[in-house]
Amino acid sequence: MTLVLFATEYDSAHIVANVLSQTPTDHCVFPLLVKHQVSRRVYFCLQTQKCSDSRRVAPVFAVNNETLQLSRYLAARQPIPLSALIASLDEAETQPLYRHLFRTPVLSPEHGGEVREFKHLVYFHHAAVLRHLNQVFLCPTSPSWFISVFGHTEGQVLLTMAYYLFEGQYSTISTVEEYVRSFCTRDLGTIIPTHASMGEFARLLLGSPFRQRVSAFVAYAVARNRRDYTELEQVDTQINAFRERARLPDTVCVHYVYLAYRTALARARLLEYRRVVAYDADAAPEAQCTREPGFLGRRLSTELLDVMQKYFSLDNFLHDYVETHLLRLDESPHSATSPHGLGLAGYGGRIDGTHLAGFFGTSTQLARQLERINTLSESVFSPLERSLSGLLRLCASLRTAQTYTTGTLTRYSQRRYLLPEPALAPLLERPLPVYRVHLPNDQHVFCAVASETWHRSLFPRDLLRHVPDSRFSDEALTETVWLHDDDVASTSPETQFYYTRHEVFNERLPVFNFVADFDLRLRDGVSGLARHTVFELCRGLRRVWMTVWASLFGYTHPDRHPVYFFKSACPPNSVPVDAAGAPFDDDDYLDYRDERDTEEDEDGKEDKNNVPDNGVFQKTTSSVDTSPPYCRCKGKLGLRIITPFPACTVAVHPSVLRAVAQVLNHAVCLDAELHTLLDPISHPESSLDTGIYHHGRSVRLPYMYKMDQDDGYFMHRRLLPLFIVPDAYREHPLGFVRAQLDLRNLLHHHPPHDLPALPLSPPPRVILSVRDKICPSTEANFIETRSLNVTRYRRRGLTEVLAYHLYGGDGATAAAISDTDLQRLVVTRVWPPLLEHLTQHYEPHVSEQFTAPHVLLFQPHGACCVAVKRRDGARTRDFRCLNYTHRNPQETVQVFIDLRTEHSYALWASLWSRCFTKKCHSNAKNVHISIKIRPPDAPVPPATAV
């Protein structure tokens, strides 16, 4: 049969109804597209509003072509009058299309009883016919509708309509338009004016040379559609196959799917694919779209999946994508490049002294003490900041001065002013540890300790009496060590020192032991873990740690290298557990300059769903196993994992520790055996907290408690030891147990004590850097990094933009910007608009800190961050809080300017501060002003505030 798509200049539903009822009018129908097939019947069609099985047109009436002579109108490109359609109407073929509307019999005396003739049925059901036509069909009466939907050129409109409306393919209009562009690579015909009449539009389509190419285009589009489906099916298969065999955490898996499709269907990739499958006029129809099969799938494998296959394989990841730089030092003790010559000294002091000796004070007392030390040593030593940072610098410094006070020429440290007790003088030659002690009612005290009584104050004398020195399992060995328990805190800092102590990280000291805060987020429904599960988890983590250590640093012997595990004690059954979504288990993520700072939230909320798995306890109404679980933690499982770096190896910058933690975070998800254990019970991604490796941050020591924030005086969640004994100590584990009880093996900056002798001791080394080649930033994982590369427009480099602002277009290719140039840029272009907005929108007591007579000093910290200080003679001072007027205001608020770029040469500057009070969220970043600074040659004002 022959199909004719037509349109009208008047309401199509009424015109069709007139044809059906054989009511002649002066209207015409305009044939737009014709699909020929040898037949004496011609079906006139309209586009349907809904598509059933991709059939987008349906007939509204049929005519006898022997009477109509359709070819005569098509050849003359003329509209068809209604009289011709009425005369040739085939009622036998048309009436079934509307029979469902004529179910109610119509009785008419004028027609001798019941009406049966089709035209009379239409007449008496005229409203139903019109309603049916308007509900089922699209009836556009203007060419502009066709142009806006199908394209603006005759080739685009004709070919798109012919394929989309007549061929019944599962393709959208946008897809068909893409097929047309690939088919007609050079010429799409003339542009159709939107003001054309329906007659002009019909004549254009009926006389278009593209009518002769419809059959070729349809064959190409069918082949292209088949090729597209095959390509996408292959992409789906590859993405799903990798997802099923890769051990991806849940959230990473979701992001991976999005990233994979973005990579496979990126704009540049689709443009390449279009060139591959473009229409080839010289090829046979069956050879169209057959070049380079599997193009998208191959590119996806090359650009993403092959990389991920290696990146998500532990051995390949460590071998190919992690880069470690180590500096070998001179072994001669008198050399300038030896550890002694470089000042790479860890903590001194005694852990088993006769008494506790050190400085204890709140942040206010600390500021006064440091001011006193500055006064006493002003002519000899550099001044110290009156804050925790100053105390850390004092306790880390190895500088000494000469004195004759004893009658002989001797050297002394500035720490003598902090701890003047003569008996402590020999202990002050090496750096001292700085701790933070949590007191009741959320008070905090800072401590610099030279001597303490660790074992005598913390452990009972007979602690190891029942610990065997023979082969025992890890589980049994752990159960032989019993510690006394306390739950009520003391207001005395000296007493509380042995219950709620936290080590403060000091970036000026080398790091000997890697202290990991490991918070494993448990799945919903996991309300307890069996003992076997907990210890297998620790053994699996030890295996991962040793694999990473051996790959990154070498000289690691897994059978004897110690890894110390501590688990946060489970909450009692009577205590509700809150904050399941809290990001950290029990480590304090603060910079602590105010004794009112808070600790982190409690562990997770109770879970309500059940996820059955071996070794996992769920909450059920009837449980087969009535024995209590070994671990009752809900929400997450908190572990402290401590291991020394290999012998004679230290890290000297916190960025190294953050990078190592990032590598371990990824490696934990890649160990096959560990993943099998973790997958049913947890979400292992990003379990290690990298935030603790910042200057001034503190982490709770093993064997210490947390303070209960609700009760104020009660302690809970003590970090208890789990002994995972290396194979070399399996026959005699007592030495390993003693090492795990030794404080010197548990601190960031203390050299390990009693480290086992190795068959081959390495030379002294410094870890300069550890870098993930694909994800150099510790703030983003692999998926996030690749997603940004795929989706985000590329920003201009900061150095390029800074040079453009300094030197104009001639300096835009500068390789580097010196600190002096950066200071000049901040003073001349960045600071004036910031100060203007600061004075306009902030209270005078805030803005006057930045105006005369105060002299400001801008100290670059890299190219993107500039610290703002006030000059006070030879010293620098910080500011009072920019947000609030605190009860005890102090000039300890740090102010910075961040610089960042966009796709143009505009420069964004943000003024932000960091206040250390609880009210200001304890050292959180508070952004005050952000401005956009346009290039010097821009015609608009230099800054726009947001």
Curated annotation (Swiss-Prot):
Keyword match Iron: no
Pfam entry (one): Herpes_UL52
Primary localisation category: host cell
Known function: Essential component of the helicase/primase complex. Unwinds the DNA at the replication forks and generates single-stranded DNA for both leading and lagging strand synthesis. The primase initiates primer synthesis and thereby produces large amount of short RNA primers on the lagging strand that the polymerase elongates using dNTPs.
Subunit-level organization: Associates with the helicase and the primase-associated factor to form the helicase-primase factor.
Family: Belongs to the herpesviridae DNA primase family.
Name listed for the protein in its UniProt record: DNA primase
Native organism: Human cytomegalovirus (strain AD169) (HHV-5)
